[in-house]
Amino acid sequence: MRLLSLVVLLLVAAGCAGGSGATRPEDAAPRIGKPTEADRRAVAALRTEAEALLAGQAELFWTAWTGGGAVDLERFYDSYEGLFTRERLAALQRVRHAETDPEAARALGFLEDWLVGELLARETAGIATRLVALEAGAEIAVDGERHDWRALEPLLAAEPDPARRRALQEAARPVLEAIAAVHAEKRERLESAARALGYESALAAAAALRQSRKETVGVLAAEVIEATGPLYAEAFGSIARQLLGEELGAIARSDVPRLFAGLSVSTRFPADARGALDATLRGLGIAADAVRIETGAPSGRPLAFAVAPPADVRLALPATARDWAPIFHEAGAALHAAHVAPGPFEFAVLGNEATAEAFAVLFENLTADPAWLREHAGMTAAEASAHAGAAAARRLYAARRHAGRLEARLAEEQAPEMAAALYGVAMERAYGFPLSDADRAWHVADADDWLFGADALRAWILAAMLEERLVAEHGLAWWREPEAGAWLRELWAGGNRASPEELARRIGGRGLDVQALVRQLRGRLGPWLPADNAG
């Protein structure tokens, strides 16, 4: 624990811990020239092309998602080949740096972050394809039996024998070593590309793409681990004893899939998810026709498509679904996009993904709200409580896992020769049980090189804060109140312009409040908490 805390302190000391905004290359040490008229014309053309590309990409995926068939992205991107050049990025940086209008500068910053992300992704696209192929063909062997590598989690969930679960986990090591070798090549390429674009490191670039800093990400991860610790110990201590017959500190990483399989509840949602969604929107006074909805997607999974928001936002729904959580998640994302006010396209489709994700999670969380489940899914009180408790346990575990992976990745940058050990320290702290050498072998395959976990944590915290505000203003059944819907539409109008931290302050907080997430989860974990500690 002290080792990780020291690393976080070193990160804070090395940077500007007081701010949460992105550190782009020239922000740290301005050496950029003044923009020319040619630069301004190039940026105007870039904005037009980027908007067209994003709309076309969404349309392409919508057609494939709802009609079936493959997506030929390579052919699609061929027509935009001239968009992704360092020369155009440099012109954009000069124009943004000289922009005196804060709103215009913010929009251009979002465009710059998107272009940087695309350039970095293109640098590693070939290696990423090799990784996918490697994982698709990999196998693990145990007692003469060979299994698809991708089936490891289901195998662990179905295996009743703890010793065999450990053997399955150990059998993954040769595959992990092969994956690590390709990952090392990918990291080297990414590091070189990020430095060529002016960033101090690939992780600095990853943080900037989340409109954040490494130091801020490290502090967030540490706060999540600290704030959720007591609740995690209570809940997962109880879960481990009841489902595995062991204390939390005595289980292994290989036992976790089995544990979560035991958390699954037999009661399923009714078939009519669309009816529940429409009823919820009616209660909020939100027009359902703001989003184009098509049911019966061949993929069997829901997905929102912001083709040209706010006018053209679409939602593909499966014909039937055993779990409504993904449906309401995508519905929340679609509603957010469909209510953005006219303005720079960057605020509607670019910007901080965690802001949009927070509203998606807010609606997803309805399917883990016992009162909403009784009202819209027809569950009994016991069934609703069981569903809510299982969902809260998964969210709590996932939050600590994200935080641990972030701490491990940030610490590794400070001492790469200690990567496996640092991963072990971070994840043992997050999980609450020891890791074996086989578990530490996951330190590369499990690494969060792009710091995606930071966005997930920010979204979950902000969603909990939004829910607390809705409950405080409109009662426990806030989804029945048109005034609650009007308030949400006001927030949606900004699109992704505001960061999660800014939006948290707008709704009355001093910033992102991890305790809001803790309170939300404690309130729903009742079935797994001692009676005197249940919220």
Predicted region positions:
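C-terminal, non-catalytic "cap/extension" segments appended to globular domains
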Residues: 28-35, 39, 61, 65-69, ...
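Conserved catalytic-core motifs characterized by acidic clusters
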Residues: 201-209, 250-261, 292-312, 333-353, ...
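N-terminal helix-rich structural modules
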Residues: 24-178, 184-185, 451, 535
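Contiguous, non-catalytic segments that form substrate-binding/exosite surfaces or channel walls
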Residues: 125-128, 169-321, 525
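Active-site recognition of the HExxH zinc-binding catalytic motif
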Residues: 322-341, 357-361
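Bacterial N-terminal signal peptides
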Residues: 5-15
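Bacterial signal peptide processing site
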Residues: 17-20
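Post-HExxH zinc-binding segment in Zn-dependent metallohydrolases
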Residues: 221-231, 350-387
